[in-house]
């Protein structure tokens, strides 16, 4: 039987304002989350520390310097693989993605 262990991957660069809202919604879906801090400023970094600590499903990875969204996603995928997740869905930190569609994406990934 194939194991399906999805994770949400959120690259973050100085966009901490809606992270708690994203984590609340993804938590209601029982979806683990990897936040990748892509060299954010101190204010954002502190906010991410608090957010990750207050959401049990969230893990925080911090990159030493900004490498861009692609580098943050790749770093997050390596972390996801090391944590034995089988699938990742990337979600933008600014809240622009429709989180109502996440379950549809996960259902499609699980059945294909």
Which stretches of residues belong to each language-model region?
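Cell-envelope/extracellular polymer assembly enzymes that use nucleotide-activated donors
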Residues: 5-7, 32
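Short, well-formed alpha-helical segments that are part of the catalytic scaffolds
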Residues: 14-28
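Short beta-strand/loop segment that forms part of the nucleotide-sugar
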Residues: 31-40, 61-63, 91
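A conserved acidic beta->alpha catalytic loop
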Residues: 37-48, 95
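Conserved donor nucleotide-binding strand/loop of the catalytic core
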Residues: 46-83
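Hydrophobic/aromatic residue at the end of a short beta strand that borders the catalytic acidic motif
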Residues: 69, 95-101
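Short beta-strand-to-loop acidic/aromatic patch adjacent to the donor-nucleotide binding site
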Residues: 85-96
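Conserved donor NDP-sugar-binding/catalytic core segment of glycosyltransferases
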Residues: 103-112
């Amino acid at each position: 039987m194939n194991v399906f262990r999805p994770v949400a991957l959120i690259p973050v660069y100085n966009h901490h304002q809606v992270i708690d809202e994203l984590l609340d919604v993804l938590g209601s879906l029982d979806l683990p989350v990897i936040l990748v801090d892509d060299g954010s400023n101190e204010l954002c970094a502190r906010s991410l520390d608090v957010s990750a600590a207050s959401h049990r499903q969230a893990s925080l990875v911090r990159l030493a310097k900004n490498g861009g969204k692609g580098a943050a996603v790749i770093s997050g995928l390596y972390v996801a693989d090391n944590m034995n997740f089988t699938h990742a869905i990337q979600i933008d930190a600014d809240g622009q993605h429709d989180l109502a569609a996440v379950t549809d994406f996960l259902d499609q990934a699980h059945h294909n």
